């Protein structure tokens, strides 16, 4: 399955200014916050990536999958990598996850492809 999401970078900037760390901690782990380096475009991209993953799994963010069940890191070539907690990888019977993030014209867009025998 494939999931896609697009986010306004300005909307994310407003949330960060208004709620500061409380906003970030709702959907990012401490290591993900460090990876974003306070860049609104990176924060928006990470938000979009987690939303895209939830859509690829056909559950959205909620009871079956929370933002913090997903972890974003970077490859040695700085490409985004996404994984889920072991519990969720098993729950969804995920074999692999592939991800891409792009930013342009004030928006961040992300795509996730999930390989699973359940989907």
Swiss-Prot record:
Its cofactor is Mg(2+). It is an enzyme of class 2 (transferase). Its EC number is 2.7.8.7. It catalyses: apo-[ACP] + CoA = holo-[ACP] + adenosine 3',5'-bisphosphate + H(+). InterPro entries: 4-PPantetheinyl_Trfase_dom, 4-PPantetheinyl_Trfase_dom_sf, ACPS, Ppantetheine-prot_Trfase_dom. The keyword Magnesium applies. Keywords: Cytoplasm, Fatty acid biosynthesis, Fatty acid metabolism, Lipid biosynthesis, Lipid metabolism, Magnesium, Metal-binding, Transferase. GO terms for biological process: fatty acid biosynthetic process. It is found in: Cytoplasm. Transfers the 4'-phosphopantetheine moiety from coenzyme A to a Ser of acyl-carrier-protein. This is Holo-[acyl-carrier-protein] synthase.
């Amino acid at each position: 399955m494939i999931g896609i999401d697009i986010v306004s970078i300005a909307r994310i900037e407003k949330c960060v200014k208004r709620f500061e760390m409380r906003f970030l901690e709702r959907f990012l782990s401490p290591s993900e916050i460090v990876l974003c380096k306070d860049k609104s475009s990176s924060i928006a991209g990470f938000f979009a990536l987690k939303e895209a993953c939830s859509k690829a799994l056909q559950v959205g963010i909620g009871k079956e999958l929370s933002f913090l069940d997903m972890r974003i890191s970077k490859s040695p070539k700085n490409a985004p990598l996404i994984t889920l907690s072991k519990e969720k990888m098993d729950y969804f019977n995920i074999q692999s996850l592939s991800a891409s993030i792009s930013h342009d014209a004030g928006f961040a867009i992300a795509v996730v492809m999930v390989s699973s025998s359940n989907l």
